């Protein structure tokens, strides 16, 4: 049977029917103001309304009284957040001085504007409790959906709220993509800025440099000066490249976090066109200059350096592309989350190109070498999986750097917003004879217009056209010279489309009740069409298959189910189908295909590693266990099973103390928390029996049998077999992702009791599982033998990095979130190395004498290295030579640099200590070594193995670095006993 032809329907954009359905709510000049005669409105919207709702909507917007909405669960909650809705715009120089009403943001002699103005900004007065635990401490809207936990701040608005606000999104509901903390210099919430801080932000400068004839340095104050720069205003829809990624993650986990369909927002941006700025700088495109790209760099300090990216110079110089350096958003100064005080806005391209907190614009011959440009915002071939993408091979490096895979222009995309997820429509009586109006949004990239939106109720056998409304076109009708928010409205001459559009289609309920689902697809003016099938890629970006909403027929109602919901919730038809065994990649959304062989997808069971020897049947009493609680033959218990650690005293990476300290104890929590799967697989070798049924409880009750060990007045804090508490008193930030945590010991005269070169164990309750603990080993930066009353621990905080599929450090994030005044438990010392001073050290209890230490470290691995180097440097009688090789990616990653440099100065008279820093991604001004700690560098700086055994290599850093260094040193003739890994 021939499929019905596409329903031919006049575009409602120009029809009278459309004008009845869509109402433009225009911002009022204010209650009682006579200078303009617009109706009182709440702004923002060319929003589709039901015909019978128009009068109610207009009536409801005629009030200018502030409203307060309490989003707390109880009115008595001290942590509740109050939101005040009010009109608060920045104005042009002819601002109305009548303070009884808001002045108009529009400057012209024309009548009232026919284009949308922003909704009233929402004033939030309280920092949310979750943000008090992060480095940002910013006031944020509690309605925003957090996609990566509390930090970093990556959020999207609820789809319903986003759509209901219409064409323009309030600043407080605009989606946010932050890779790390907000730069501290701009993190003060705008509502609390004092004059001094405001001036400092107006004095914020960014540079234009590189391959230009006239380098520039421009302050925000200068940028806003109409006598110096042509400020313009126009609307732009920003879209995260990960919008709709959750759908890809359900099919197959990508390396990115789960955006829903709300990863986009639209605002009126005010600033100066990048083409004008570059025209003054004059890029050197000829005479051997070769300028082809424009790189942007922000002020945020991240694990991989500052955030930066690039676009092609030809685009940046094209006024029609509309790339802007913006300082206002919806008439307001930028919020810190949106780039305060100045940012780049790149219309039609993914949001990742619009760099926030702008500090540098650099004209170059090639694309940006910034880590975030190379290893983010790419659609790699679908054959590249998560494991392969992380391989450190030349081939994989080449794939990542292939500019063909970089994402610039957005692709065409569309979403069904109404019906919403979980919405129920009644079919009872007269209601069932009516219609339902499907509504949603669509967008395209590169300035291209969405030219059609098609809807199918039969899974693509037939299609019908929806009407499309383009609110952006209303700005093209503005009169020449009209200003908005201090910038010339710069839209009328453009052919490009920078914004989303709205579509709608009336469907008889009688047809919906026969359908299994509703699918939509959009096409842009280049005839690019949304595909039916998903193109999965390892970063999960640019997902744009047909948007499908399932219809559930439940008696006399219809219930609608969207594909997914943002975050980690398993809500939506995709998760449901997957759990039912459906194959989401079968081309039919996981449904069973008539005539096709059923292919049930089963989840792989989690493989548990056995830690017992099944042949061992011996029962061990508590008395027997206690006979082995010393150093001679240490036994310990894990999960009720008894293990003999004696054979592994020599080989344990943490030294014999790690085992003898556990002797006679149940160390289940500690063992499972810190040991790898490989370590667990080794355990059957040391398994000797099972505790008798009554022994575990008795062992637990006797764990604190010696009161002297926990006596707070004892002179030494650390105990090898007992956990003792210290109070967190202060967190000292030393870099964006590193802090020194200060703890108060039991009394001011108490020493830590940690020999040089040893570590301690730290234990915290797991916030996600209160009945479980997190345990990790750390090396304090305190002097473990001399310092009294306090304990200082330097910790690099591994924040969640969704782009790289990293959940973040369990311990470090929990420690960072811990409130001051809370207790943390410690135990120790542990470790196989002790430096006794003046060249004497011991390894696993065996003493040896050295004349030279070569210490290789990276990142927070510097802490045990610093301990040893300090012990050498502060003792004028210690003639041991020290060479420290500290390798990092960027200069901001170097920890304790000033302390290490001070040690060098202190030991300078005898020239005993040298420190060399090397960076794999150095900045232009870096004067130290460049490159990785590789074979070439180790051969040059360390040399061949010392056959006399008078030199030791001490090594601490990331596992990959440690393995590489050990392998290289082995090839250079270094013996295993001369290379020690902390």
UniProtKB/Swiss-Prot annotation:
Induction (UniProt): Its expression is highly regulated and responds rapidly to nitrate induction and to nitrogen repression.
SMART domains: Cyt-b5
Note accompanying the cofactor annotation: Binds 1 FAD per subunit.
Domain of life: Eukaryota
Catalysed conversion reaction: nitrite + NADP(+) + H2O = nitrate + NADPH + H(+)
Keyword Metal-binding: yes
Binding-site positions, Mo-molybdopterin: 240
Subunit annotation: Homodimer.
PANTHER family in the cross-refs: SULFITE OXIDASE, MITOCHONDRIAL (PTHR19372:SF7), SULFITE REDUCTASE (PTHR19372)
Record's protein name: Nitrate reductase [NADPH]
Gene that encodes it: nit-3
């Amino acid at each position: 049977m021939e499929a019905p032809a596409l329903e031919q329907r006049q575009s409602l954009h120009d029809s009278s029917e459309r004008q009845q359905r869509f109402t433009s709510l225009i911002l009022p000049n204010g209650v009682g103001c006579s200078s303009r005669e617009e109706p009182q409105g709440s702004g923002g919207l060319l929003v589709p309304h039901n015909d019978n709702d128009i009068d109610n909507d207009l009536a409801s917007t005629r009030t200018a009284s502030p409203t307060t909405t309490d989003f707390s669960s109880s009115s008595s909650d001290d942590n509740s957040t109050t939101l005040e809705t009010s009109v608060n715009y920045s104005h042009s120089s002819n601002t109305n001085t009548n303070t009884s009403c808001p002045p108009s943001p529009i400057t012209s002699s024309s009548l009232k504007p026919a284009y949308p103005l922003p909704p009233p900004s929402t004033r939030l007065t309280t920092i949310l409790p979750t943000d008090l635990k992060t480095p940002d401490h910013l006031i944020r809207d509690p309605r925003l959906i957090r996609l990566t936990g509390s930090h970093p701040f990556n959020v999207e608005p609820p789809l319903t709220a986003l759509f209901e606000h219409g064409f323009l999104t309030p600043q407080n509901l605009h989606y946010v993509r932050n890779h790390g903390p907000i730069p501290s210099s701009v993190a003060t919430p705008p509502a609390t800025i004092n004059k001094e801080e405001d001036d400092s932000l107006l004095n914020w400068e960014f540079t234009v440099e590189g391959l230009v004839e006239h380098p520039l340095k421009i302050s925000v104050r200068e940028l806003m000066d109409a006598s110096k720069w042509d400020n313009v205003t126009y609307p732009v829809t920003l879209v995260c490249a990960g919008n709709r990624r959750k759908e890809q993650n359900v099919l197959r986990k990508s390396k990115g976090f789960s955006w829903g369909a709300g990863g986009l927002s639209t605002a009126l941006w005010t600033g100066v066109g990048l083409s004008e700025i570059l025209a003054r700088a004059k890029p050197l495109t000829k005479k051997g200059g070769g300028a082809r790209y424009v790189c942007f760099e922000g002020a945020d300090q991240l694990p991989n350096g500052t955030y930066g990216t690039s676009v092609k110079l030809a685009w940046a110089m094209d006024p029609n592309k509309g790339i802007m350096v913006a300082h206002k958003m919806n008439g307001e100064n930028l919020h810190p989350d949106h780039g305060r005080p100045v940012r780049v806005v790149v219309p039609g391209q993914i949001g990742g190109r619009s760099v926030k907190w702008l500090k540098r614009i650099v004209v170059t011959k090639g694309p940006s070498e910034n880590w975030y440009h190379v290893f983010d915002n790419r659609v790699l071939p679908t054959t590249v999986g998560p494991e392969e993408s992380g391989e450190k091979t030349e081939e994989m490096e080449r794939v990542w750097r292939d500019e063909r895979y970089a994402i610039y222009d957005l692709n065409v995309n569309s979403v069904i917003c109404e019906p919403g997820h979980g919405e129920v429509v009644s079919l009872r009586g007269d209601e069932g004879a009516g219609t339902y109006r499907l509504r949603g949004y669509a967008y395209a990239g590169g300035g291209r217009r969405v030219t059609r939106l098609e809807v199918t109720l039969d899974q693509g056998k037939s299609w019908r056209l929806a009407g499309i409304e383009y609110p952006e076109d209303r700005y093209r009708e503005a009169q020449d010279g009209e200003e908005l928010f201090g910038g010339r409205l710069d839209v009328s001459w453009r052919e490009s489309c920078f914004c989303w559009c709205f579509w709608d289609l009336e469907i008889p309920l009688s047809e919906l009740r026969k359908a299994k689902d509703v699918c939509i697809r959009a096409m842009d003016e280049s005839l690019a069409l949304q595909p039916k099938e998903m193109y999965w890629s390892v970063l999960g970006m640019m997902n744009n298959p047909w948007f499908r909403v399932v219809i559930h027929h439940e008696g006399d109602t219809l219930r609608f189910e969207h594909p997914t919901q943002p975050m980690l919730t398993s809500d939506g038809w995709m998760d449901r189908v997957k759990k039912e065994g459906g194959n989401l990649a079968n081309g039919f959304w996981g449904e069973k295909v008539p005539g096709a062989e059923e292919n049930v997808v089963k989840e792989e069971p989690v493989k548990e590693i056995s830690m017992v020897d099944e042949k061992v049947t011996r029962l061990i009493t508590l008395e027997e266990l206690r006979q082995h609680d010393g150093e001679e033959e240490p036994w310990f218990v894990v999960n009720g099973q008894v293990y003999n650690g004696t054979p592994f005293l020599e080989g344990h990476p943490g030294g014999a103390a790690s085992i003898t300290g556990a002797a006679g104890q149940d160390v289940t929590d500690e063992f499972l928390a810190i040991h790898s799967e490989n370590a667990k697989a080794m355990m059957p070798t040391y398994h000797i029996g099972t505790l008798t049924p009554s022994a575990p409880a008795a062992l637990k009750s006797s764990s604190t049998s010696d009161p002297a060990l926990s006596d707070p007045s004892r002179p030494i804090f650390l105990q090898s077999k007992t956990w003792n508490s210290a109070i967190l008193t202060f967190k000292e930030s030393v870099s964006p992702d590193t802090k020194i945590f200060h703890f108060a010991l039991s009394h001011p005269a108490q020493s830590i009791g940690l020999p040089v070169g040893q570590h301690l164990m730290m234990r915290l309750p797991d916030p996600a599982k209160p009945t479980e603990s997190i345990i990790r080993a750390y090396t304090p930066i305190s002097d473990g033998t001399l310092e009294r009353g306090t304990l200082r621990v330097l910790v690099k905080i591994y924040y969640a990095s969704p782009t790289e599929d990293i959940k973040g450090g369990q311990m470090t994030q929990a420690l960072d979130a811990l409130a001051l005044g809370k207790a943390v438990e410690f135990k120790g010392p542990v470790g196989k190395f002790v430096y006794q001073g003046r060249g004497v050290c011991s390894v696993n209890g065996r003493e040896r004498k050295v004349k030279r230490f070569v210490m290789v470290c990276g990142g927070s691995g510097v802490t045990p290295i610093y301990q040893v180097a300090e012990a050498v440097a502060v003792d004028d009688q210690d003639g041991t030579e020290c060479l420290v090789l500290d390798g990092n990616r960027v200069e901001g990653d170097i920890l304790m640099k000033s302390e290490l440099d001070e040690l060098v100065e202190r030991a300078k008279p005898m020239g005993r200590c040298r420190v060399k820093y090397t960076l794999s991604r150095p900045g232009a001004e870096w004067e130290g070594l460049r490159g990785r700690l590789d074979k070439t560098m180790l051969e040059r700086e360390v040399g061949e193995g010392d056959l006399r055994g008078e030199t030791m290599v001490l090594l601490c850093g990331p596992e990959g670095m440690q393995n590489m260094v050990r392998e290289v040193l082995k090839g250079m003739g270094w013996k295993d006993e001369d290379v020690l890994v902390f």
